[in-house]
């Protein structure tokens, strides 16, 4: 038996530096002019039924045939402002640099048009850079959007530091526990989950601090070399 796990590197200065940077961001006070937003994305396989499922009835769960039809793949984008209890999720056919850039444009012009700066926490996927903005928009617009971002990357093998990844896990359990074979249907389900979750304004109160990390995760820090 085995489990797949994200194992951080031991005694790694780059990991420790990025981890402490993100932890410091999470402990900033709430500031609507500089909201802290986390983002993540995940691939999703659209699946259809070969045979109609048998509905649940007293004493018997719903039954699905183990054979299915692949209906393509897509990517689910998730944006979370932990201190406000706000989420935005939607699925797109692709996850290219241009797709990410248009997601950022929506974030800055629709979700946060009045924020001076959006503090963005995400992993260091190659599409997650301001260079992607220049592939999607003219230089003036790309520069203007980039100037409103303050980007902080989680360390490699440190996905547990991304609140948006935690939210995607919750979304998967609560909303994606059955087969969906159409992008429009998937987006309708995501919109319903988003509306319900946002109406509850469930905030994320991050307790783990840099002081905690230096004690509980001290094996991740390199040995200090002093002259």
Segments from the language model and where they lie:
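C-terminal domain-tail junction helix/linker
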Residues: 11, 50, 185-227
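Extended, low-complexity cationic-aromatic segments
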Residues: 19-105, 217
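Mobile genetic element proteins and their domesticated derivatives, centered on retroelements
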Residues: 38-40, 79, 85, 104, ...
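RNase H-like polynucleotidyl transferase catalytic core
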Residues: 63-68, 141-163, 180-181
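RNase H-like two-metal-ion nuclease catalytic core shared by retroviral integrases
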Residues: 74, 123-124, 151-173, 184, ...
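Active-site proximal helix-loop segment of RNase H-like, two-metal nucleases, encompassing DDE(D)
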Residues: 87, 164-183, 196-200
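Short, basic/hydrophobic alpha-helical segments
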Residues: 98-119
């Amino acid at each position: 038996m085995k489990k797949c796990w994200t194992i951080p590197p031991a005694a790694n200065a780059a990991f420790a530096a990025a981890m402490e940077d993100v932890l410091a961001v999470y402990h900033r006070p709430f500031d609507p002019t500089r909201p802290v937003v986390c983002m993540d994305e995940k691939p999703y396989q659209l699946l259809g039924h070969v045979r109609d499922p048998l509905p649940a009835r007293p004493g018997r769960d719903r039954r699905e045939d183990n054979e299915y039809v692949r209906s393509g793949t897509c990517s689910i984008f998730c944006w979370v402002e932990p201190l406000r209890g706000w989420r935005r999720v939607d699925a797109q056919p692709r996850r290219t640099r241009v797709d990410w850039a248009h997601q950022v444009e929506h974030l800055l012009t629709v979700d946060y048009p009045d924020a001076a700066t959006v503090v963005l926490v995400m992993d260091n996927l190659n599409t997650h850079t301001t260079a992607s903005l220049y592939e999607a928009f003219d230089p003036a617009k790309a520069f203007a959007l980039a100037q409103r971002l303050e980007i902080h990357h989680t360390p490699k093998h440190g996905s547990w530091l991304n609140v948006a990844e935690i939210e995607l896990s919750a979304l998967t359990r609560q909303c994606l526990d059955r087969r969906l074979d159409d992008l429009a249907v998937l987006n309708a389900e995501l919109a319903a989950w988003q509306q319900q979750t946002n109406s509850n304004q469930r905030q994320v109160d991050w307790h783990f601090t840099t002081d905690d990390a230096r004690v509980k995760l001290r094996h991740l820090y390199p040995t200090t070399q002093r002259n």
